[in-house]
Amino acid sequence: MGSDKRVSRSERSGRYGSAFDRDDRDDRDTRSRRRDSEYKRYRDERSSERYDDYRDYDSPERDRMRDRERRNSDRSEDGYHSDGDYMDHDYRQDYYMDEKESKTIMLRGLPININENDIRELVESFEGPQPADVRLMKRKTGLSRGFAFVEFYHLQDATRWMEANQKKLVIQGKTIAMHYSNPRPKFEDWLCNKCGLYNFRRRLKCFRCGAAKAESDLEAPSGSSDAPQSTDYYSDSGYVSSAIILRNIGPHTVVDSILSALAPYVSLVVSNIRLIKDKQTQQNRGFAFVQLPSTLEASQLLQILQTLHPPLKIDGKTVGVDFAKSARKDLVLPDGHRVSAFSVASTAIAAAQWSSTQQAQQSGEGGEYAYLQPGQEGYANYGQCSQDYQPFYQAQTGAAEQSTAPQAEGSAPVPATTSAVVCQSPQMYQQPGSPTQSGTSTAANTTPASTTSTTEEAAPPNAVIPGVKYSVPDTSTYQYDESSGYYYDPQTGLYYDPNSQYYYNSLTQQYLYWDGEKQTYLPAADGAGQSGAQPNGANAGSSKEGKEKKEKPKSKTAQQIAKDMERWAKSLNKQKENFKNSFQPLSARDEERKESAAADAGFALFEKKQGALLERQFMPDMMMMVNTEEEEKPPNKALVAAYSGDSDNEEESERLLGAVDEEKLLDWKKLACLLCRRQFPNKDALTRHQQLSDLHKQNLEVYRRSKMSEQELEALELKEREAKYRDRAAERREKYGIPEPPEPKRKRFDPTVVNYEQPTKDGIDNSNIGNKMLQAMGWKEGSGLGRKSQGITAPIQAQVRMRGAGLGAKGSSYGVNTSDSYKDAVRKAMFARFSEME
């Protein structure tokens, strides 16, 4: 019967089931946990790849990444599937079937050990358009995440590069797939048209203003494919705005020039133009914004400006136009995207990247402006600007440029045709193969037939010659001089003041300003001086230009410029003296005199970085000027002759008193200090001793006091006493004496004795109420209480008991009364304890 025993119902389908069912259930649980872990890992990888795959560098998705990750669990439709649908849906195939062309290309499946340089070298090795940027996505550990982005300057460059490589690359023996990178459309949120706030998909009312979701859906359906899209309202990057950005603006262009250039096409006022300037140099950063009333007018103006032939020019520079990215958060595109707020710095970077892709062909009468197209000459060298410009840039800055050679009297100047490529910084560089401009050697040999101004004598190679055309000043190459607070231009040797926007020529001691129309530096003088400096060959155009200059008032006069230069010239006079003493011979030092403000500025400017200045070409000429200044006495070419050393007579007089005495105490031939009686090995050691030695300063002070008269000594002592600290407390103690010190405080005080009433201290008499009551009841004095007089005969005495001791406990009472003092209580307690020990 044991073999025929069947499994009971409780064993087969009871609470825990059979052993076979339990094993099968364990296997299913293990597989389920493994599948869940694989799904979780796959979901994390897909979420990170999806973000980097569909994001664009300027996309607002980057700012909303955290909210998107937080709401991943809620997505169940509109392209975002729920958790159960991840394994059944292929995002890659669905997305790349309808991918849109973009100027950013994504490389997927890269090796882990690859870096950005490897990708950049491989991409640049191909013929054709060169990329603008290559970015490899990395993890926190520094390893590659397996994909990278290659960004091109234009959409046509990216498409041509993709077609040339057939959307595949071979990197380190591995085939890499290439795809266009585009931002994923947002379906999970809806935008409120009233306040511009993005709300969660499940919210039926706006969180901020309470507007209904249905109203926003009717007015602007988010993510709808049927949304109207107008090509006139969109630029290449896919955004729309009522503002237009003007790129490649000259550094000295003003708002009036922009208004006059746009006047034939649109009516604007000054408030519609915003010209962006650098905070340090106060020059234009290369772009401006034009704000229009509506996007329709902006699109119409943009279409007109983009179809102009020749293109729009402002102050002789070809200007590029495009829609500007709005900084308002409520700007919504028809496809549901929101343009996030972009700072001016990001716009400047975009403008610089845009300008680096342009080719401006300039000539005397005008030129063409267009992008380099595939197949054109020089397209293969599209990205070699940074490599090719170096030798030509050095050749260009090694000598002063002169594009218009002076001709005979009455003949018009002949402009030299040049072509330049605008690189990432707003500088003009020559292309390979273009005719180079004439150098200073040609300009020095060819002189005008007749000029009213005197010719420059022995100008150094990098000296600025008035009337010669130069390239537009590039403030990005200026070097900041800490000693003077000015910016040094290594190309022209001029010093630039960002406050007054004037240049200072330290060789000729002149203030210059940049003229954008003439492309040259002109002296900041009156109109007569400027007109006299022009050649006779340009008399026809000088009168017209003179009228235009009169209409444009100067921001600062020559007097104001001199006052600005005077501030820092005073502070550096002392350093100038030390600098001049280190180079002048002893005979020249004995004949020191006050110098003009222009000379002070020149010495202060040339004092910076003496080691670097010695290597420059104009340093020997400057040294000759310093040494022979007192002998030749050239005419002062500064703007204001009224300013000289007289403005700081007090400081100059105090300094000269010590300087004359100190020079007599130094022997520069023997390199010895006669005051301290010390000899030094070289000139530098003697100079350091003179400037830094405390012993020399003390001896010099003693020597000066010995040469002073009694009145001078008294005046000096009085001045020193006034400058010293006055101890008024000591004077007060001397006058009124020192008060008695307070008595020291006692550490212990005797407790105050309180005399309280003690009526039973001497015993109880017969006058108390208790005694009278007992006598009324038949009690007699001396007998005990009770029926048989067996009770106590004396009253109960109040006693102090030990804490915690019962009434009958041993040692509960030491016989201490309430009237006993502290000493009596301690004495009785000690005696009781002693008795107990016995």
UniProtKB/Swiss-Prot annotation:
Keywords attached to this entry: Metal-binding, mRNA processing, mRNA splicing, Nucleus, Repeat, RNA-binding, Spliceosome, Zinc, Zinc-finger
ZnF endpoints (C2H2-type): 671-696
Biased composition annotated in UniProt, kind: Polar residues: 396-406, 416-439, 531-540
Domain (RRM) ranges: 103-183, 242-326
Positions of RanBP2-type zinc fingers: 186-215
SUPFAM superfamilies: Ran binding protein zinc finger-like, RNA-binding domain, RBD
Primary location group: nucleus
An example Gene Ontology molecular-function term: zinc ion binding
Presence of the UniProt keyword Metal-binding in the record: yes
GO biological process, one term: spliceosomal complex assembly
Region (Disordered) residue spans: 1-86, 396-473, 524-561
GO cellular component, one term: nucleus
InterPro entries assigned to the protein according to its UniProt record, in alphabetical order: G_patch_dom, Nucleotide-bd_a/b_plait_sf, OCRE, RBD_domain_sf, RBM5_RRM1, RBM5_RRM2, RRM_dom, Znf_C2H2_type
Domain spans labelled G-patch: 766-812
A Pfam family it matches: G-patch
Protein's UniProt keywords contain Glycoprotein: no
Cellular location(s): Nucleus
Ranges of biased composition (kind: Low complexity): 440-462
Purpose: Component of the spliceosome A complex. Regulates alternative splicing of a number of mRNAs. May modulate splice site pairing after recruitment of the U1 and U2 snRNPs to the 5' and 3' splice sites of the intron.
Family stated for the protein in its record: Belongs to the RBM5/RBM10 family.
Assembly mode: Component of the spliceosome A complex (also known as the prespliceosome). Appears to dissociate from the spliceosome upon formation of the spliceosome B complex (also known as the precatalytic spliceosome), in which the heterotrimeric U4/U6.U5 snRNPs are bound.
Cited PANTHER family: RNA-BINDING PROTEIN, RNA-BINDING PROTEIN 5
Protein name: RNA-binding protein 5
Species of the source: Xenopus tropicalis (Western clawed frog)
